[in-house]
Design a protein with these regions (language model features):
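Conserved short alpha-helical segments that host acidic/polar catalytic motifs at enzyme active sites
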Residues: 1-250, 254-255, 266-300, 338, ...
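Generic C-terminus detector
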Residues: 257, 548, 561-563, 573-614
Length: 614
């Protein structure tokens, strides 16, 4: 959600902070700000509503000197988007400037307590309460900043990632986290700080991921010091990250989202590299090899996820049940964690998250672990909280996803779920060798089939203009195509702001058919499958009510082509692999409609890439 950046060292902090905020724009935000310790030890704070570019204009001609600072992009949780509510927030005496990601649940109680002691507040945010609390504790006890932060955080209930600078101690930054990500970049006599590693790849590939309850003390030229709230040292070794600048640039595309749609063939190849042997048509997953006993004795799989990852989980359910004959439940993590679910020690919980930082999914993991379940994580970001909280798992290896609307992460998640189901099905003996090799062989061919679909982008761009002013959409699919329909509807909602709903095609008669008329576009995934004839009947019913049909069909299907207003043809593949190919035209359709409507495709309103608060 919010993005934090910090720097302390010998370089000028301002350009590093601004560049870092731009790297974090993909997380979503409504305002931005920065605090700089100037060369004359003045604490200068600049804020603006809008984009990072607006912050740059605000600071034009101002004193942006200094080699120490923190910065922030805010996504409003407490208080509307405004300059006053933007971070950094300052203490009563103006000595401290703090940036914060998360939610302080008991902020109202703390605020009342501070007001009774004479503190006054300028904003309506929980963050200002936190910095005022730290400042009050520091002033009352004449304490150093670290001790004041430790004492203040003991009173806090909620989630936080914070970075604090102190005018009286201009040679340090104090950073802390609980249930919200924070990464320290380690350079030569300098430190970088950010919500994820993307802002620091220009300067260092050595990072330390802070764990819950840890506080980092960053001083230029000094070793990194990490302690807990009780001042007990927490040893860490820096990890080497493999990000490169090219992965964080558009590469000639007008938007990151379009680039990431077109990246998918290569991403899926990367996801399979080292795991799929195309010569022997076999799959090797180290997580399955190393934890075979725990996975094979599972009486049930429970998939927990949110948003797009939940849709991937629905496909995973069908794959695992079909290949492994093990029952699978798919749960919204936000519902699962609060409904007192029945969890058995022989359950395997699969947690799916692109960022690896989704707050509700992390909470669901902790609940399942507390009841003895084995946890398998599927995420994209190496070293993320979910990757560290699970017993084992698989990275999707699709590279940084900058567009807020997920594309390549979705197909990466589906690919890993396919590999997991194949590996387990073979180990269990529930998938015949012939079928196993046939599916793997087809899976190897998927990237090239994706490229074939992408060649139709001009056609999809052309007819998407016909739906620029549509107010509603219905998406339909059956079997493996139903989650694809859900994901297609979500993509359209996210970036074009058109209301869209996905349904199983058979459920059309149970309500949605009442909405169909000449003004209602219907997107239907109708590739060849055992249910093809039934889906064909659905299309005929839609056309009988003058509905406009966009059909995703298998190459050579002339029957539906003659019925539909527009049809997008896909290369033939196995039904279980159709989602990998069929999702691409729906991503392109959503993208081009949003572009026609003049929307901010990469940073749609009110959305955050990484939902790190509940």
């Amino acid at each position: 959600m919010c993005g934090i950046v910090g720097y302390i060292g010998k370089r000028k902090a301002w350009p590093i902070l601004v560049e870092g905020l731009k790297r974090l724009e993909y997380r979503g935000y409504d305002s931005a700000g920065a605090a700089l310790m100037s060369d004359t030890h003045q604490l200068n704070v600049y804020k603006s509503v809008g984009k990072v570019a607006d912050l740059e204009r605000t600071a034009e001609g101002q004193d942006v000197s200094g080699c120490v600072g923190n910065a922030h992009t805010r996504w409003a949780t407490h208080g509307e988007p405004s300059t006053v509510n933007a971070h950094p927030h300052c203490s009563q005496n103006g000595d401290l400037a703090l940036v914060h990601n998360g939610i302080i649940e008991n902020y109202a109680v703390l605020k009342e307590k501070l007001q009774a002691k004479g503190c006054t507040f300028k904003s309506s945010t929980d963050t200002e309460v936190l910095v005022q609390l730290i400042g009050y504790i520091q002033q009352q006890g004449n304490l150093d900043l670290l001790t004041a932060v430790q004492l203040a955080l003991r009173e806090v209930i909620g989630a936080y990632a914070i970075a604090v600078v102190d005018r009286k101690h201009p040679d340090e930054i104090i950073a802390a986290r609980k249930s919200s990500p924070l990464v320290v970049g380690v350079g030569e006599g300098e430190f970088f700080l950010a919500s994820d590693a993307t802002p620091m790849v220009t300067y260092t590939n050595q990072v330390v991921y802070l764990s819950d309850g840890e506080i980092a003390v960053l001083r230029a030229g000094a070793p990194l010091k990490i302690v807990d709230l009780n001042n007990v040292e927490c040893p860490h070794e820096a990890q080497t990250i493999a990000l490169n600048i090219g992965q964080l640039e558009k590469g000639g595309f007008p938007h990151f989202m379009l680039k990431e749609i077109f990246d998918q063939p290569d991403c899926i190849s990367d996801c399979m590299r080292g795991r799929v042997n195309p010569d022997t048509c076999t799959v090797t997953l180290s997580a399955v090899s190393n934890y075979k006993e725990q996975l094979l004795r599972a009486g049930r799989f429970i998939i927990v996820a949110c948003g797009t990852s939940w849709h991937a989980g629905l496909i995973g359910k069908q794959l695992i049940e079909s290949f492994c004959r093990i029952p699978v439940e798919v749960e919204y993590a936000s519902e699962f964690r609060y409904r007192n679910p029945v969890i058995h020690p022989d359950d395997v919980v699969i947690a799916i998250s692109q960022s690896g930082e989704t707050a509700d999914t992390l909470a669901a993991i902790e609940l399942a672990k507390s009841q003895g379940a084995f946890i398998y994580g599927i995420c994209n970001v190496i070293g993320s909280s979910i990757a560290r909280a699970t017993d084992t798992g698989s990275y999707i290896h699709v590279g940084p996803e900058i567009g807020v609307a997920s594309t390549k992460a979705f197909t990466g998640q589906v690919t890993v779920l396919t590999l997991l189901a194949l590996a387990l099905g073979r180990e269990k003996g529930t998938l015949s060798e012939e079928e196993y090799h046939r599916i793997v062989k087809e899976l190897v061919a998927v990237p090239e089939k994706m490229r074939t679909v992408l060649k139709q982008h001009s056609f999809i761009s052309y007819f998407s203009k016909m739906f620029t002013y549509a107010r509603n959409f219905i998406y339909l699919g059956r079997g493996y195509a139903f989650p694809v329909a859900l994901e297609g509807a979500l993509k359209l909602k996210e970036i074009s702001y058109i209301h869209a709903e996905g349904y199983p095609a058979a459920e059309m008669k149970h309500g949605p058919i009442a909405l169909i008329d000449a003004e209602m576009p219907v997107v239907i995934v109708a590739t060849q499958s055992p249910l093809y004839e039934k889906v064909l009947s659905n299309i005929q019913e839609i056309k009988a009510r003058k509905g406009r049909v966009v059909a995703v069909v298998t190459e050579g299907d002339t029957v539906i082509r003659n019925l539909a207003d527009y049809s997008i043809e896909l290369p033939a593949t196995l039904e279980c692999l159709d989602p990998l190919v069929a999702s691409i035209p729906l991503q392109l359709l959503a993208y081009y409609i949003a572009v026609c409507r003049g929307m901010d495709v990469d940073q749609p309103r009110n959305l955050a890439k990484s939902v790190t608060v509940e």
